[in-house]
Amino acid sequence: VGKSVEAGDVVAYLGPFEENGGWVPHLHFQIIVDRLDLEATFPGVASPSQRDVWCSLSPSPVDMLGIPQSAVAPRSPHVQDLLERRNRSISSALSVSYDRKLHIVRGWMQYLYDAEGHAYLDAVNNVPHVGHSNPRVVKALHRQMRTLTTNTRYLHETILDFSERLVATLPESLEVCFFVNSGSEANDLALRLARAATGKQDTVVLEGGYHGNSTSLIGISPYKFDGHGGKGRPATTHVVPMPDSYRGPFKGMTAETGAAYARFVESAVAQGTCAAFIAESVPGVGGQIVPPPHYLRAAAEHVRKAGAVFIADEVQVGMGRPGSTFWGFELDDVIPDIVVMGKPIGNGHPLGVVVTTRAIA
């Protein structure tokens, strides 16, 4: 402090990564116009709310260093400006979360980061199953993208390796895969398979259920057709109560409670017009409800006796997320006729899978 510096003087050397405390080697060059009588180290960073004050005391050194403005990282746009741009070009039907809108600029593993550097533990965005920007996923994507981008009309080992590893995690009867681009496409295909296999059209669903945003899936999603802007339940959709052992009419996490809720499914399929009973193995949008024991098993038995099939929607709950099992339906020791997976199986990238029996396929 207080020493004069001439153009061309050496002011610093950059050491190796290890000498820099594990940080990327860099030069922290800061102009201070007023030390404010501070004896200790002058602040080198500041919270976003204090940025303008500290910038007035430590103006940008780019002119002194001869750095062109084009090399300076621009200040992030104001959230309100981004919101106005979004409102001009993106449908208002697509909502933005939270009263104080978040400008998220990147994600790393379990964290999201906003434009001001705040980190958020991501407990909402459920599609990056093994974390945002997971290095192993990025590496695998890069490897495949530089090798081949194609579809299923040609032979290629990768899709075969993937399907074989996937069905190895499932019950033996579930052995045929269909690959699509999303959970919505997967559920739509599952419905088509069920209707083709049974020759019937109707569907039994749980109250509060959500299975996708295509026209056919809105029609089997009470969360959508009973929600804001919904058109109500189609005649071919039959809604049964959520198997909620805490708030519902039957209490307790017992097999008796599960059997009691399954009787609603039995009544719904009794008329013989149903092609399928579709349910999330652990309903997500409906409230993160863990069904009581024996519910899915008993419901599947009733469904099959009526000539229909059981579709397990594992988009939100499958692939290890139950904790003690790999698939949600395994919690009740039941084998579905069709299993549906969505974007989480691609860590948020456009991928969905339908796995079913050879007879249905």
What residue spans do the PLM features occupy?
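Conserved N-terminal phosphate-binding loop of PLP-dependent enzymes in the Aspartate aminotransferase
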Residues: 73-361
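Residue-level marker of beta-strand positions
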Residues: 4, 9-10, 119, 344
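Short beta-turn/strand-loop junction motif enriched in small, turn-promoting residues
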Residues: 14-19, 223-225
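Conserved "cap/hinge" positions at secondary-structure junctions
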Residues: 9-15, 359
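Acidic, glycine-rich catalytic/binding loops that coordinate metals and/or anionic ligands
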Residues: 3-6, 16-19, 23-73
